[in-house]
């Protein structure tokens, strides 16, 4: 079993409050989870309104497939 992780540090320019940031992050996480069948969550900077840290994890039998899936997530975000 191969487990791959991806850590994204995102700057959100159009966010002007924590509520707006959380709405944007919720949309991103939902689309990433549904499109790529990975686990994703906001893992850092929860109190900053223009910055977010997202963690993504994928599991598979083949390293190339896991790496490719995480590369697609990175390009998508």
Feature roles, as predicted:
Residues 1-35, 39, 76:
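N-terminal first-folded block
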Residues 3, 41-62:
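Short, charge-patterned binding micro-sites
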Residues 25, 53-55, 71:
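Residue-level signature of transmembrane alpha-helix interfaces in integral membrane proteins
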Residues 60-77:
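C-terminal structural segments of small proteins and small subunits
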């Amino acid at each position: 079993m191969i487990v791959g992780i991806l850590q994204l540090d995102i700057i959100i320019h159009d966010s002007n409050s924590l509520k707006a940031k959380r709405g944007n992050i919720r949309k991103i996480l939902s689309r990433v989870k549904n499109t790529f069948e990975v686990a994703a969550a906001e893992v850092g900077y929860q109190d900053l309104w223009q910055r977010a840290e997202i963690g993504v994890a994928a599991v598979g039998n083949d390293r190339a497939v896991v790496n490719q899936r995480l590369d697609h997530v990175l390009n998508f975000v």
